[in-house]
Each structure stands twice: as C-alpha cells, then as structure tokens.
Amino acid sequence: MNSFPWLTTIVVLPIFAGSLIFLFPHRGNKVIRWYTICISMIELLLMTYVFFYHFQPDDPLIQLVEDYKWINFFDFHWRLGIDGLSIGPILLTGFITTLATLAAWPVTRNSQLFHFLMLAMYSAQIGLFSSRDLLLFFIMWELELIPVYLLLSMWGGKKRLYSATKFILYTAGGSIFLLMGVLGVGLYGSNEPTLNLETLVNQSYPVALEIIFYIGFFIAFAVKLPIIPLHTWLPDTHGEAHYSTCMLLAGILLKMGAYGLVRINMELLPHAHSIFSPWLMIIGTMQIIYAASTSPGQRNLKKRIAYSSVSHMGFIIIGISSITDTGLNGAILQIISHGFIGAALFFLAGTSYDRIRLVYLDEMGGIAIPMPKIFTLFSSFSMASLALPGMSGFIAELIVFFGLITSQKYLLIPKLLITFGMAIGMILTPIYLLSMSRQMFYGYKLFNISNSSFFDSGPRELFVSTSIFLPVIGIGVYPDLVLSLSVEKVEAILSNYFYR
C-alpha cells in the first residue's frame, strides 16, 4: 500500500492540465500543440514508472488501491485500483492518446478546445479502466461521450452532425441500460447501496434476476464494442471523424466495451454468463462473417476499415464466451493488438486523405508511385490486420482458436461449426484488405491535378506509424509481454466457473 495517491494523480492530471489550455494567449497553435504533447508524454512516463515499480503482475488481487469517501449520504467512494486485466488497456490508452495528439498537428481551427477535449477523453478512459466502484465506472463511461460528440460535430467531415447525433443516440441509449444495471446491482438485497466491486463479486443473486442484470449490462457494452445489430453508428462515425479522433475511437473506445464485458458481466454475474455464452459464441461468429462480407461493398475507405474492426471484435466475443483461460487471455491480447492495428490503419487513411483529398476508393489508384512510404506502411498494417504470422493479430486469433477448441463447455459439433465460421471470416479478411490496398495503391489512374501536391509522408507520420508498428511486431514475436500481465487475473476470474 503506497502513501502517495498514484492512480488519482494519473487520472486527474490530463483533465486538470488540459483545463489550463484556456488560459494560454491566443497567439499560436504551436504552443498549445507542444503543451498537449508534453502533458501526454509526462502522463505516459508517469504511468510506466508507477506500473514498473509499484505493480506486481503475479498477484491477482487489486493493487494500488485508493479509497476516499466522496458522498457520505449513500456511501459513494472515489475508489481506484488496478489489476492484471486493466493494466493492458491503461497502457494502451496512454500510448495511443500520445500518438493521437501527435497526429492532430494539422488541426488549427479552435485548437484550444480540440486539445482540451483530447485530454479530457484521456482522463475519462484511464478513470474507467482503473475504477473500482460501479457508480464511478458509470460516471467515467458517461464522461467519455461528451468529448467524442464534440470532436465529431466540430471537426468532422461533411455529414458530421448526422453521424455525431447517431453516435450520441446509440451510446446514450446504451448508457440507460448500464445505469439501470448499476442501480439494480447496487441496491439488491439491502437498503444501503453497495457499489464496491470487491464486495459485489461475492454477492449472489437469483438466476432470473441475474439474467435481467446481465441483459442490461450486455446491451450497454454491446453498443460500445459494436455487436451486430447495434454496430451501425460505427461506420458513420469513423467515416466522418477527424483521423486523430478515429485513432482514439478505434484504439480505445471500442475496447471499453470489451473491458466492461469482462469486468462486470464475467466477474459479477458468472451464472448468467455461462448461460449466455453459447449465444455470445454464435453472435461473435456471425459478426466476423457479416462484417467481413459487408466490408468490400463500402466505397468509403474509412468505412471499410471500420467494418474490418467490427469483424475483429468478433474474435474478442468468442474468446470471452469460451470460458477458458486460453480463450480469455486471447481476447485480452486481441484487445491490445487491435488497439494498435486499428489506430494505425485509421491514421494512415487520414494522412493519405490529407495528401490526395479523395475519400472514395474507386476514385483513387496509382498512389504507390508518388508515395512509396505510405504504401509500405499501409501494406504492413494490412498484413498485421489480416493476421500474418509474426504480427500480433495472428497470435491473438490463434490463442482464441485454442481457447475455443479446448473449452470443456461445448460439444464437438458446435466447436467445429464455430471454427468453420471463424475460418470463413479469416478467408474473407484478406479479400477485403487486399482489394482495398489494390484499389488505393495499384492501377494506372492519372489524377487531373498536378503531381506537385503529392509529397510522401514526413517525419511526423513516419514516427507515429513506426512507433505503433514496433509493439505490433513485438507482441507478435513475444506475446508474453501482454499475457504475463493478465494470466493470474484470468485464472482468478475463471475460478468462479466451477461447473464449466
């Protein structure tokens, strides 16, 4: 137990430092950009320091616990703590947000507000991943939505208001169910609300009530980690948002749904989860095939990448519903891996849009000749996304496969059918990714504009892309980097499932 409140510092620092941006003089955007990047870097370094020196990965209990009484009236605490499950997403958040602030250099309009919103999002995400109180979890979940809505509706594309409204309707509608679930779980069986996650893990419910709670939480998380048919906000949002916002959306926002699914639905409601997991398995397989076959029909480049990320979320659902150590570890690895790969793909799509000002794939072509570096990076990340061995996507999907096959819960025929479905999805993934690459970079289309406006990626773009590419290769070569953090915690979660 540390005396210094490390986690509170990590959560509060970005939004506190971001609110100082408005005190800056209005002279230049450069000061604001450098200030934001420095804050993100300091935050990332602080995070790594704390987790290196004060976190033991082989301990499945909650560490770095902080508990301050906040509202005496109904026993509401500011309660933070991390374990092996939340440390991966927290570090991913720090990494991706730092690179997204670096990717937002071209933003000049209202840059004070833009960078403040980026930092506010940073705080809310880390608060969500480290909160140990259900109501605090809900507050951070809601605090996330406001910056995304503003970033969408102010710095988006042509149809930005439509997609921002769609986003806020979907996610706020999901949050209603989340709030009802939080209140139901907290108020069950006592006059005093118990919101502490530690005590709620040991709470047992009647099966019917547990199923109702499970459905409520599941709808809220299914909107965020888009599970079909609640996924339609995602392609619109990604098609319109500025690409630094897209990096945050694809890298972290989608992972909040998966994290909530593991943290609340698996830990708090194990009986209902083992009842629902066959259906989840079917939904995940359907989602892999559906999104992978919808993706080639999209003209918009960003929408195509968005559908590919919906398809990759199917592997996370299958890993979570396999109820094995291997499957859940693979799902966590896929969370981290897709966080890197999705963010990089959206970043490269955005930078190439900045170069050529074309969104639709059938208008592009032949870009590989003037822009070889972007072509190389885009091809590499496409390979990582279609699970080439040696990259992180391959090892994550392989571990999910193993988890499904070794699962005690399912019979042989369902396992074979689901494996067959996953294999169909894995065949469709190279089809849309390689056709996307072909339509963008190959071909003979000569542009009407003069070639003077084409310059290859500068040092900033190269730095962002390579610094995302290194962890992808690193996790692919040595996946224990991520797995060693979560493996003890996964065993602790699955020890509740004694009737697997």
Curated annotation (Swiss-Prot):
GO terms for biological process: aerobic respiration; ATP synthesis coupled electron transport; electron transport coupled proton transport. The chain crosses the membrane at residues 4-24, 35-55, 87-107, 111-131, 134-154, 167-187, 208-228, 242-262, 272-292, 305-325, 330-350, 386-406, 416-436. It is found in: Plastid, Chloroplast thylakoid membrane. It is an enzyme of class 7 (translocase). InterPro entries: NADH_Q_OxRdtase_chain4, NADH_Q_OxRdtase_chainM/4, NADH_UbQ_OxRdtase, ND/Mrp_TM. Its EC number is 7.1.1.-. This is NAD(P)H-quinone oxidoreductase chain 4, chloroplastic.
